[in-house]
Amino acid sequence: MRTKVKYLLIILLVTTQISCNNWMDLIPPDGLIREEYWKTKEDVESVLMAAYETFAETDHLLFVFGEIRADMVVGDNNQSRNEELISEGNIYPDNEICNWLSFYTVINYCNEVIKNAPEVMEFDRTFTEFQMQSLTAEAYYLRSLCYFYLIRIFKDVPLVLEPSETDNTDFFPTKSTDEEVLTQITNDLIQNRVFAPNGSFSNIEENKGRASKAAFEALLADIALWRFDYEKVIEHVQNIENTAQFFLLPGSVWFENYFPGNTLESIFEIQFDGDRNQRNSTYDLTRFDARRYDPSIKAIEMFSFDFARELVRGENASIRRYGEGDYIIWKYVGQAADGRTFRSGTRAYSCNWIVYRYADILLMKAEALSQLERYSEALAIINQIRTRADVLPLNLANNPVAFEDAILEERALEFAFEGKRWFDLLRMGRRNNFARKQNLIDIIIKNVPSTQKRILATRLTNPLGWYLPIYEKEIERNRNMIQNPFYNF
């Protein structure tokens, strides 16, 4: 038994001093024990920055979990075998992609900040109540965001609210239901949003890359939409609209959302900076010579000049043609919406990962309005997005299914390859007691090998198969962990 427990945050994953800009240069030094830490405001900030940095390291997983089981990307020759198996529907608990350690590492950092920050005020008289509440609010936000990803990926997961820092820690937690997790994080966000920063940092990277009040409202809107609480979605989106701080970029500069990023449309995005060796994963996932992920046939038909009139979001913006019938994802490798100017040097790995932007929350609101049968208001928002993209407005029948399909299509156009498509489809499949379950199944099996389509379609009539299994090593390690019954082969 350990007699002096090392500060677990430090010994888990922080093995390098990577930072994306000055505000993330504070990482806890290796080898500290708890009794030597949590003495100053800087100690709190450094652990919070470690949480942000570790979350940034999940960008590869956010792409994989948000895209590869859907219909907008396909694997190329160098797609990893584990990811190929998932995209083909051959999903088993021994697949390392099912390891949730990265998310729980972020959660543990956040738990440390939440638990210990108040005590630091006793040692550091310059650490004010206002500063403490602001930093802990950011920790609540990151923890809630991680849990929101976890329940959409795995459904029921352990709800760990205390840091792993003593011998009394429960290292064998049981799972909580997804609803229990959603209730917890919703309450945490509502209680702490008042303390969140509000654009008061001295640089754009912090204002867009740290959990602001608007980021709180965006996450709350997203959670409410997942729970089909449409009035709450509208309330949270309107709270953002009322700030008058965010706008849709003109179509002529739409690509600035990706280069250089941090635009007036941005609400919250993970910051990367190749100059500081804080490199994203999306460049290597999507560049042509890597041959890992390409646009699907559906994406090509949505964006290619051969099939569509998407002048703002289409060919040379979202995708780029490489010879006859060959395309790459352009958002993360291009420097302009011209299909010619590539990111180069350290800029190649500097594209941020956008978690929320204004177009996203507007379409959340449109979805909520349409489900409440407020069709004219919903249509106005859809056409606002389309007008910005220089495409013709829609006329839709006044029924929720027509609007659901139109919004799904608009979100696919606007947020292609941004890690949102799978979760959008999953939300559609769950709505109204799985009324459109077959639509989701048809989409899932579209890109799987023909020999597997019928078998997979039958298996996926069980909605538990829409979620990933718990990694087998987690089951072996934790005697209280129960596998998703869909994967009890």
Map each language-model feature to its residues.
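Elongated scaffold/linker segments in the mid-to-C-terminal portions of large proteins
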Residues: 39-43, 48, 52, 76-102, ...
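Structural register within alpha-helical repeat arrays
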Residues: 136, 143, 150, 213, ...
